[in-house]
Amino acid sequence: LAMADATGAELIPGLASILETEAPGVSIQVLPLTTRDPRPMLDDESADLAAGYFPAVLADLTARAQVGKAVAFAHQRLYEGAYVCVMRHGHPLASGPLTLNRFCAARHLLVSFSGRPFGFVDEALASQGRERRVVLTVNKFFTAGEVVTRSNLLTVLPRHFVNIAGANNELVQRELPFDIPAVQVATLWHSRLEHSSAHQWLRQAVTRAAHQAFEETPPA
């Protein structure tokens, strides 16, 4: 099972509870997901299931299916993620409105699995003819939270992650001063496993864990 740390923080507690009560003889290994395209690791069986935000992959699979091409992977929506801008308490931008100009003028940290300093936030800014200055990239959401609490950098994190990661008291959350596309978190798997009873159980367990997590996540 491959997923990023922010996704795992939300899903794994519920999944562990399901394992304990319903399948105590089952073992699951969670691998770090360091790509927005997990198809190679699913194809070579490095992972049986991936959970995360895969916009380009899902768009490609949908396009292939629409023109009648073979599609070797299946997917299922888990939840819609909301993202917020976060900064440390006492940050110069922590009081007062976070305007688009202030956001773009600040120094930013970006969570990037590839290390590329350009993500979906930057795509949204570019569509408005704007850009921000990314001075640091890391590949884990937990690391991003720790860095921001000890610096004047801004970062953009999943709202649910800030709420459950114990950083709520150390970070100030602000709504983004621009619109971003909906972030659809989904599971992805190779079609050869579609009818495997064990894999069907795993997919259902992950989906249930997601539903439980968002029912229990306190509002921001």
Where is each model-derived feature located?
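Residues at or immediately flanking beta-strands
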Residues: 25-29, 133-135, 172, 184-186
